[in-house]
Amino acid sequence: MDIMKGLYAAVLTSMLVLSGCLHEQSGIAETSTYEADDAAGSATSGTTDTLLRLRLSGRDSLSWTSTNIQLSVGDTVYRCSLSGADPCQISAQDGGDGNAWEPGESIFLRESGTDICTEPACTVVISVVYDGDQLTGDSKIIVD
């Protein structure tokens, strides 16, 4: 009987200790946000214009392998990547970790062989997704 009481007490203690570990943790996408601004240059009919600057806020870095950034102009969606193999290239400026977008770090999005914004006053819709979850931020910017 004493063995059963001891076992019962051990199970209850384990449940109490582990209960704090079992609740749902808030995701990085819920605690990270970004701000978007028009980049300094003007939109032209060229294919190498720097369009936007995005700055990450929050406490966590976003791994580039789990981060998906897309721009939309009209009905056309443009995927952005670090490699420049996509129509939109991500240029990381001031972070220390080349594998992640860090809080406080600004990145620039520029055309990479595709004319995304032909002329000034181009409306660009921005989507930043981390690990399948949409980040909160400026969703639409006018590029001049």
Residue ranges: model-predicted function:
Residues 27-76:
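Short, surface-exposed binding/anchoring microloops in extracellular/periplasmic proteins
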Residues 113, 133-144:
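Edge beta-strands of extracellular beta-sandwich domains
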Residues 35, 108-110, 142:
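Generic structural detector for well-ordered beta-strands
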Residues 30-41, 82-94:
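Generic structural motif
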Residues 71, 128-129:
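Short aromatic-centered micro-motifs
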Residues 83-123, 129-131:
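Short, solvent-exposed, Trp/other aromatic-anchored flexible loops in extracytoplasmic proteins
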Residues 1-31, 52:
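Secretory targeting signatures
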Residues 75-81, 135-137:
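Surface-exposed loop/edge segments in extracytoplasmic proteins
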